[in-house]
Swiss-Prot record:
Identification of the protein by name: Protein YIPF5
Tissue specificity note: Ubiquitously expressed with abundant expression in pancreatic tissue, islets, beta cells, and brain. Highly expressed in coronary smooth muscles.
GO biological process: endoplasmic reticulum to Golgi vesicle-mediated transport; insulin processing; protein transport; regulation of ER to Golgi vesicle-mediated transport; vesicle fusion with Golgi apparatus
Lumenal side: 146, 195-196
InterPro entries associated with the record: Yip1/4-like, Yip1_dom
Stretches assigned to the Cytoplasmic side: 1-124, 168-173, 218-236
One GO CC term on file: nucleoplasm
Cited function: Plays a role in transport between endoplasmic reticulum and Golgi. In pancreatic beta cells, required to transport proinsulin from endoplasmic reticulum into the Golgi.
Species: Homo sapiens (Human)
Record region (Interaction with Sec23): 75-106
Effect of I98S: In MEDS2; no effect on differentiation and function of pancreatic beta cells; increased endoplasmic reticulum stress-induced apoptosis; decreased in C-peptide levels associated with increased proinsulin accumulation
Amino acid sequence: MSGFENLNTDFYQTSYSIDDQSQQSYDYGGSGGPYSKQYAGYDYSQQGRFVPPDMMQPQQPYTGQIYQPTQAYTPASPQPFYGNNFEDEPPLLEELGINFDHIWQKTLTVLHPLKVADGSIMNETDLAGPMVFCLAFGATLLLAGKIQFGYVYGISAIGCLGMFCLLNLMSMTGVSFGCVASVLGYCLLPMILLSSFAVIFSLQGMVGIILTAGIIGWCSFSASKIFISALAMEGQQLLVAYPCALLYGVFALISVF
């Protein structure tokens, strides 16, 4: 115990006072504190109010004019999807490839075998007229009591395919399948007249045979003339007319019997 008391006496100096230490350590506002000289001029009443540097500049006088940007944004006008004007668009029939003027010219070319055919018009792929003529041919057969729509379309497809292969072998320029179908379909028009006669009287006599032969020659001559004009096959009309006569002969047999 005597040693412990000596240790405590040595640890604390005789001149040490706790009151003096606390006064020296926490006396920040006094003149003797370590922070009194550094923060003596700081005003604590301004604490919490921050002023940006831009606000310290003097304000510009108001001139009465609203601020206007130098370059205004002008949105681009939307482009119409269907063009500038609907009146400039082609008609719907023309977009579908149906031209009544060309249909009429081709029909007149078939009805007048001696008329010179326009190769530029005949080389077009126009299936509107041939479809109408095929339906008319089947309708006249129906009036005669013959339901032969399947035979008409089947023979037409086989005949167009055969003529397509033959003309591509004979011509130098070549021909499309649509052009062949268009020409053969238009030249079916005289065959409609033959089937119409079959509604009125029988074609199994001598008059019917002569009329049938004339109609076959008419159809084959018109088709061969158009093919020669469209494909520039001068001097080969008889070679083209022969397979055409075979095709239209089958249609004539359907009309007669």
